[in-house]
Amino acid sequence: MAQVRIAVRLQSLGLPLRQSLAMAASMGASAIQLEAGKDVRLSELSATGIRQLRKMIADFDLRIASIRFQTRHGYDHADGLSRRIDATKDVMRLAFQLGSPLVINQIGNVPEQTDHPRFESMAAVISDLGRHGTRVGTFLAAETGTESGPALARLLEADENAFVAAALNPGKLIVNRFGISDAISALGSRIQIVIASDGVLDLAAGRGIDVPLGQGTADYPNILAELENRQFKGHLVVGDEQPGPESQARARDGVEYLRNL
């Protein structure tokens, strides 16, 4: 089974930065995920601020597994696209300075057909961001879930000279009725990080719903075994998308669940 390296999504803890770091460390995590613009305003960090933040994180024996940069729209949305691309590049550059190997974003709804006009425009953006990642040293990771794994893989493979990673989100795949194993098979070694989430299909409601990690249909022992076959060495990120009354307990339970696999 692949080695379980756990990161905590700091935003889910709903605490100031230093307290969040202390709690993540107390849970037994080895890394964190920061939210650009929420946990820390990257654009306002000076060189001194970057050094201080890196030291603060290291003081808790943690590292940054990824930075989440959630744009209002994906790269499939033409309005304001140039600004989103430039902002993504800026975050990737600052992420490298902070020691983060990945910047995660939901890139938009990828068409299943490669001859779709939207596929072609998204492929051009992904190529641009992939080449930028090679230059700056931190890569964009496209989160799974809004399309099938094979559809996302076709987009990421459109330019063999530009690398964009994948952030596997099993819960979102379940909720949107896509196969997890299909996604792992299609994306392979591009999977650099896992958003440790879970879900079930609510047949009565005709839709999928999010549930706490370990309480849904995501088969994490099998997921980790499949990832091990593809030399996965990344982190599994635990934590709710938005902090709530139960988020701290859910994060702690999630860490314990993964450590007990």
What are these regions (language model features)?
Residues 1-7, 14-30, 58, 99, ...:
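Histidine-acidic metal/acid-base catalytic patches
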Residues 1-92, 96, 100, 255, ...:
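N-terminal pre-domain/capping segments
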Residues 6-8, 39-41, 77-79, 115-117, ...:
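Short, contiguous strand/loop micro-motifs
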Residues 9, 140-144, 215:
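Small/polar loops that bind or transfer phosphate-bearing groups
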Residues 12-14, 36-38, 70-73, 107-111, ...:
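Active-site-proximal loop/turn and secondary-structure-junction residues that shape catalytic pockets
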Residues 18-19, 56-59, 75-166, 175, ...:
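Active-site acidic/histidine proton-transfer and metal-coordination neighborhood
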Residues 33-34, 64-69, 100-107, 140-144, ...:
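Short beta-strand segments at enzyme active-site cores
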Residues 38-43, 72-78, 111-115, 175-177, ...:
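A short acidic, helix-capping loop that chelates divalent metal ions and anchors anionic groups
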